[in-house]
Swiss-Prot record:
The protein's annotated pathway: Secondary metabolite biosynthesis; terpenoid biosynthesis
List of catalytic residues: 483 (proton donor)
CDD domains the UniProt entry points to: SQCY_1
Compartmental location: Membrane
Upper lineage: Eukaryota, Viridiplantae, Streptophyta, Embryophyta, Tracheophyta
Domain of life per record: Eukaryota
Purpose of the protein: Component of the phytosterols biosynthetic pathways. Oxidosqualene cyclase converting oxidosqualene to cycloartenol.
EC numbers on record: 5.4.99.8
Residue ranges the record marks as coiled coil: none
One term under GO cellular component: membrane
Top class in the EC scheme: isomerase
Protein's name according to its UniProt entry: Cycloartenol Synthase
GO biological process entries: pentacyclic triterpenoid biosynthetic process; sterol biosynthetic process
Organism: Panax ginseng
């Protein structure tokens, strides 16, 4: 039976700063699990399989089965419902909250964080399997049980038409279909296995233009595997890393997630690396193309992209640029004497790869550059210590649920979820009943703050200050993020106001000052906050965005979510420490509020870039402005935002927004105008902050009724459609949101609507 293990090391090649706090890995143990537990696991797997086309999102049931046995909760209060025409009583809200928090406390790990699924994208696992296959360690890293669960996941998320999407809820794409088909073949599935599934997948590929029409990232992966020629790729010259930093196009000015992906890609491209040509590779050359491999026009293939994948079409200037680099630049740098510069650039790239690896304890900023960096380390030296240090950290990215084993979009969302969970529980004004839960969470948050900057000259490594920040996941990961720092900061400040005998000692003031310093350092000149770093270049650089599948990825843009979170954190700090950098903080808050007003859409909404979508962005927009001192009566932006949200409430009383809002940038209801507990929570929080209860509380009562009646018998809330997003077009799972935001919204509703303003 599979078991989720928390904060464990046990491998001599693992490095850690804090005894692996937050680490979550799944291990298979054939000697555990009662017959009843094993039967329950098989039952939920079968249920997912039988309903996979109607309900594409797993509900993290394997973790729930394990924790139900390990963390038995107190006696569950009887379930309550609100009938039509019935007024909502404070008692029913309180019972719902206690049931919800009692259940959610059982999902907390012993180190204080809440583990959960952070999967969703369908293009991550292929990179891992391709890399393991090339480097010859597939069977070392992945046991037969791992392979079985990965295959289960891939088959479960194959669409009816035979293809695979960019993410679990998306329509079939060439990128998703080719890579997942290849992954299954590398895992040992035959070309006609899967009860016809492989044949359907292959037919989808051939019917839609064949693998020559895969996206640029797909072309790169197929090229290193040996199923595509490098001449069919647009250039990624490593020499760009030797350019003067003053140039706007220097890669050090890119958004760090893109920079850290194109860094190892440029190494592999610069070396034209190709893995061993195995019988499976030779067979794939026949399976995924519609003409014989040796007859493919690779130059034409460079710019081919299936229409199903084309979210960001290449502008003409980009095609001219790639053609120039391909026909002029590359022939020069592949031969002496210019080849000397190529070799120098490759050495520079590897220095940056090693710096990234070492400063994330070989976790890396994300799963794409994790496996690419690992492959580059192997290409540089197959017997290197760096390659061996990479191997055990692969398991940090693997998550298991009833739909199978997936690769997550990070090594988890540990800090992010815990910071929100703390704020949600405290909002209920019932915190004294959940002291042990909050104490453990407080300990986790104190253990997860980044305590040092990266070593060396930060400018030379294109890094921002880190000391005092909070990461998205774990301290071992360590990359600082503006909104994660702000949300973590808000949570520890709220905890500091509770009795220390209940929640533990507060964070030392010096570490709070470090957090303030990070937040202030991340504000751009326009008042907005980006994610990891300052915005370092210009939006016109999107003209050279080579990733057809993603939008707005080349630079680190300022976002309403990050800007609002910074306002909230600085305001909370200012109230507790009014003398520390007072004028700087006040000036920062005012600039940030003006930025939020400036980027509001004409319909009153804000576009959410990290959650689905306008309900998420508008919650942050309203919250930021209210925290900065604006009110409904004094601020037209807040009035417009409230009108927008109220116009989107559906007949059931809730809100339900489709992921299509993200990619199309137009508010789109869920199919059938259904509600979603997470969207409903966000909208409620926004409207409560904007004083909706003082004007007309009816919309809030209707929404609260929806949340109360959505609660499950055990106190959990249902997993509904996917609610996270990145790069405008790819969705990602936040499994904890279904618990956090109903608790938070009902907590605020209980204290600020039913009980009235304090």
């Amino acid at each position: 039976m599979w078991k989720l293990k928390i904060a464990e090391g046990g491998n001599p090649w693992l490095r850690t700063l804090n005894d692996h706090v937050g680490r979550q890995i799944w291990e298979f143990d054939p000697n555990i699990g009662s017959p009843e537990e094993l039967a329950e696991v098989e039952k939920v797997r079968e249920n997912f399989r039988n309903h996979r086309f109607e309900k594409k999102h797993s509900a993290d049931l394997l973790m729930r089965i394990q924790f139900a046995n390990e963390n038995p909760g107190s006696v569950v209060l009887p379930q309550v419902k609100v009938n039509d025409g019935e007024d909502i009583s404070e008692d029913k809200v309180t019972v719902t909250l206690k049931r919800a928090m009692s259940f959610y406390s059982t999902l907390q790990a012993h180190d204080g964080h809440w583990p959960g699924d952070y999967g969703g994208p369908m293009f991550l696992m292929p990179g891992l399997v391709i890399t393991l296959s090339i480097t010859g360690v597939l069977n070392v890293v992945l046991s037969k049980e791992h392979k079985r669960e990965i295959c289960r996941y891939l088959y479960n998320h194959q669409n009816r038409d035979g293809g695979w999407g960019l993410h679990i809820e998306g329509p079939s794409t060439m990128f998703g279909t080719v890579l997942n088909y290849v992954t299954l073949r590398l895992l040992g599935e035959g070309a006609n296995d899967g009860q016809g599934a492989m044949e359907k997948g292959r037919q989808w590929i051939l019917d839609h233009g064949s693998a020559t029409a895969i996206t640029s990232w797909g072309k790169m992966w197929l090229s290193v595997l040996g199923v595509f020629e490098w001449s069919g790729n647009n250039p990624l010259p490593p020499e760009t890393w030797l350019l003067p930093y003053i140039l706007p196009i220097h890669p050090g000015r890119m958004w760090c997630h893109r920079r850290m992906v194109y860094l190892p890609m440029s190494y592999l491209y610069g070396k034209r690396f190709v893995g061993p040509i195995t019988p499976t590779v030779l067979s794939l050359r026949k399976e995924v193309f519609s003409v014989p491999y040796h007859e493919i026009d690779w130059n034409q293939a460079r710019n081919l992209c299936a229409k199903e994948d084309l979210y960001y079409p290449h502008p003409l200037i980009q095609d001219i640029l790639w053609a120039s680099l391909d026909k002029v630049w590359e022939p020069i740098f592949m031969h002496w004497p210019a080849k000397k510069l190529r070799e120098k650039s490759l050495r520079t790239v590897m220095e940056h790869i090693h710096y990234e690896d070492e400063n994330t304890r070989y976790i890396c900023i994300g799963p794409v550059n994790k496996v690419l960096n690992m492959l580059c380390c192997w290409v540089e030296d197959p017997n290197s210590e760096a390659f061996k240090l990479h191997l055990p950290r692969l398991h940090d990215f693997l998550w298991l649920a009833e739909d199978g084993m997936k690769m997550q979009g990070y090594n988890g969302s540990q800090l992010w979820d815990t910071a929100f969970a703390v704020q949600a529980i405290i909002s209920t004004n019932l915190a004294e009943e959940y002291g042990p839960t909050l104490r453990k969470a407080h300990t986790f948050m104190k253990n997860s703050q980044v305590l040092d900057d990266c070593p060396g000259d930060l400018d030379a490594w294109y890094r921002h200050v880190s000391k005092g920040a909070w990461p998205f996941s774990t301290a071992d990961h360590g990359w600082p993020i503006s909104d994660c720092t702000a949300e973590g900061f808000k949570a520890v400040l709220q905890l500091s106001k509770l009795p220390s005998e209940l929640v533990g000692e507060p964070l030392d003031a010096k570490r709070l000052y470090d957090a303030v310093n990070v937040i202030l350092s991340l504000q751009n000149s326009d008042g907005g906050y980006a994610t990891y770093e300052l915005t370092r270049s210009y939006s016109w650089l999107e003209l050279v965005n080579p990733a057809e599948t993603f939008g707005d990825i080349v630079i680190d843009y300022p976002y309403v979510e990050c800007t609002s979170a910074a306002i909230q954190a600085l305001t909370a700090f200012k109230k507790l420490f009014p003398g520390h950098r007072r004028e700087e903080i006040q000036h920062s808050i005012e600039k940030a509020a003006l930025f939020i007003e400036k980027i509001q859409s004409s319909d009153g909404s804000w576009y959410g870039s990290w959650g689905v979508c306008f309900t998420y962005g508008t919650w942050f927009g309203i919250k930021g402005l209210v925290t900065a001192g604006r009110t409904f009566s004094s601020c037209a932006s807040i009035r417009k935002a409230c009108d927008f949200l109220l116009s989107k409430q559906v007949a059931s009383g809730g809100w339900g927004e489709s992921y299509l809002s993200c990619q199309n940038k137009v508010y789109t209801n869920l199919e059938g105008n259904r509600s979603h507990v997470v969207n409903t929570g966000w909208a409620m929080l926004a409207l409560i902050d904007a004083g909706q209860a003082e004007r007309d509380a009816t919309p809030l009562h209707r929404a609260a009724k929806l949340l109360i009646n959505s609660q499950m018998e055990n106190g959990d809330f249902p997993q509904e459609e996917i609610m996270g997003v990145f790069d405008k077009n790819c969705m990602i799972t936040y499994a904890a949101y279904r618990n956090i935001f109903p608790i938070w919204a009902l907590g605020e509703y209980r204290c600020r609507v039913l009980q009235g303003p304090s």
